[in-house]
């Protein structure tokens, strides 16, 4: 296939137009008064969203050079979402500013490699400064404030704080859809284990890359399933029952996986396979925990039980199974006396444990079994409102977990302003071009504050000037339009979210400024005279 190549300034200009197309769309959502973006859906009603990564994911530009620039910024948002669960809009705004400043330096004659060195140095320094400023999250009020700031709703903040109080900071919290208008919290029996689907072809929801099974049968075994023939008899019974099946096994051969996937895709039966969590003896115990929760008979090698002899009575039941790439959550709505007995056995084993390793494993299993699963059931008047609310709650939940991991810093962009003040005169290099790279990052730290103020209807420049005059932890409350003690007002951000936003924005910016050529494929019978002056 033929290629078309752009060089130097022309290539950078095209990439920058793509960067601006995506960043200008995403940044309108930043802050407590950020606006929404409406997204066309091919086979569904339009979605109205406030989530940076969800917006960025949907943007495809006709011009391939611009599209490359847009996709690189989407990667910033996506990486930030993967690592911190929130902060995607902040990361996008920072990336746009850094790329603009970096390209300006290169176009003025600076050496891209040295500028890149300065960007990387500054980003790492900013990340360290943020960690040094971080305040540990202990109080219930802090958890509520983080969730409220992320979601833009005090009600959501309260619900997430209550959920964490009930199942613990490390407990399992899932977001589900309610049939009513109200958003409610419910705690049910369940557990989560650290293994996801054995093949991505089991996924039913491509957008979230998850699969959910309702009222499912459960097969729990420490056997390695080597041939399809071993499980054909029980699969035939499952097909007759017309119910989905979750298989939790030590391992499943690729040939067997292929057959199961093919049958699922054909609609013969609904099945998902996950490998067993843990290793060795601990794996057997965890499988027995799953069997007790689901009321399944644990099909054990040690007891010489064979997969070919399985009957329907050997399978367990679960109200809902949510299977993701790296974990599986099992939810049961019924109380089980066997589960209570299992919990008591674990408590006794903890008392009698002879090593720290054994105690730790037993405590982890006990926490998983006894903590239950908190379900946040999202209610709304319309499907469009429901989707938006669900996204906000998921972001807020991720932000709260990030805050528990690394702590919190002052919000409203003030933490980055304070780091700017600390570094603008102290982070210096003898090399002029490395210094230009440092300035690319340090000067960009003021941009989130500017954008938050602008979206709230204030002069971004004036607010930034005032922010620089405020004492430590004091800053602009964009919702109320006044300067306050941000910590007292509960305007806080998770350190991990802010830190990852800076690191990921700097990473892509450092790579983009070293670009001297852009190559795209020419499609046959298409008009390839792209207009670089427009964004399509």
Swiss-Prot record:
Reactions mediated catalytically:
ATP + H2O + a folded polypeptide = ADP + phosphate + an unfolded polypeptide
Kindly report, in one word, the top-level EC class recorded for this enzyme. Answer: isomerase
Q: Which GO terms describe its cellular component?
A: cytoplasm
GO term, biological process aspect, one: protein refolding
Q: Where does ATP bind?
A: 29-32, 86-90, 412, 493
Q: What are the subcellular locations of this protein?
A: Cytoplasm
Q: Which CDD domains match?
A: GroEL
What the protein does comes down to: Together with its co-chaperonin GroES, plays an essential role in assisting protein folding. The GroEL-GroES system forms a nano-cage that allows encapsulation of the non-native substrate proteins and provides a physical environment optimized to promote and accelerate protein folding.
Q: Please give the subunit comment from the record.
A: Forms a cylinder of 14 subunits composed of two heptameric rings stacked back-to-back. Interacts with the co-chaperonin GroES.
Stated name of the protein: Chaperonin GroEL
Which organism was this protein described from?
Onion yellows phytoplasma (strain OY-M)
């Amino acid at each position: 296939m033929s290629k078309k190549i752009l060089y130097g300034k022309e290539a950078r200009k095209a990439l920058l137009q793509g960067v601006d197309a995506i960043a200008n769309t995403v940044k309108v959502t930043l802050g407590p008064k950020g606006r929404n973006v409406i997204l066309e859906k091919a086979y569904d009603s339009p979605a109205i969203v406030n989530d940076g990564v969800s917006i960025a994911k949907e943007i495809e530009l006709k011009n391939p050079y611009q599209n490359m620039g847009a996709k690189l910024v989407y990667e910033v948002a996506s990486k930030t979402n993967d690592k911190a669960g929130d902060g995607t809009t902040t990361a996008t705004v920072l990336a746009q500013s850094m790329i603009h400043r970096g390209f300006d330096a290169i176009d003025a004659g600076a050496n891209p490699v040295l500028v890149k060195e300065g960007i990387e140095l500054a980003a790492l320094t900013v990340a360290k400064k943020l960690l040094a400023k971080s305040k540990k999250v202990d109080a219930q009020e802090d958890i509520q404030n983080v969730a409220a700031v992320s979601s833009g709703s005090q009600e959501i903040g309260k619900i997430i704080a209550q959920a964490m109080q009930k199942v613990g900071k490390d407990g399992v919290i899932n977001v589900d859809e309610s049939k009513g208008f109200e958003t409610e919290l419910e705690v049910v029996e369940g557990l989560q284990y650290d293994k996801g689907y054995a093949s991505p072809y089991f996924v039913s929801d491509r957008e979230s890359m998850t699969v959910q099974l309702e009222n499912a049968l459960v097969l729990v075994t420490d056997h390695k399933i080597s041939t399809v023939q071993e499980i054909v008899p029980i699969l035939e019974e499952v097909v007759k029952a017309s119910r989905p099946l979750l298989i939790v096994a030590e391992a499943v051969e690729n040939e067997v996986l292929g057959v199961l996937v093919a049958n699922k895709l054909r609609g013969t039966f609904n099945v998902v396979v996950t490998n067993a969590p843990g290793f060795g003896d601990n794996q057997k115990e965890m499988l027995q925990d799953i069997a007790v929760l689901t009321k399944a008979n644990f099909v054990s090698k040690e007891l010489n039980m064979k997969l070919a002899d399985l009957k329907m009575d050997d399978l367990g039941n679960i109200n809902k199974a949510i299977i993701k790439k790296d974990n599986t959550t099992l939810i049961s709505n019924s109380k089980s006396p066997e589960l209570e007995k299992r919990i008591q056995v674990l408590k006794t084993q903890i008392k009698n444990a002879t090593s720290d390793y054994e105690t730790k494993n037993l405590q982890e299993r006990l926490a998983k079994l006894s903590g239950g699963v908190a379900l946040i059931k999202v209610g709304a008047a319309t499907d469009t409102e429901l989707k938006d609310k669900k996204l906000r709650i998921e972001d807020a939940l991720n932000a709260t977990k990030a805050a528990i991991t690394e702590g919190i810093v002052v919000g409203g962009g003030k933490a980055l302003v304070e780091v700017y003040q600390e570094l603008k005169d102290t982070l210096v290099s003898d090399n002029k071009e490395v210094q230009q790279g440092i300035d690319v990052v340090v000067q960009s730290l003021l941009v989130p504050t500017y954008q938050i103020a602008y979206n709230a209807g204030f002069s971004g420049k004036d607010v930034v000037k005032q922010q620089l005059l405020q004492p430590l932890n004091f800053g602009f409350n964009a919702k109320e339009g006044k300067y306050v003690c941000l910590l007292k007002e509960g305007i806080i951000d998770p350190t991990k979210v802010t830190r990852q936003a800076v690191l990921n924005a700097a990473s892509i910016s450092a790579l983009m400024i070293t670009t001297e050529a852009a190559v795209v494929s020419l499609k046959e019978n298409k008009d390839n005279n792209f207009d670089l002056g427009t964004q399509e």
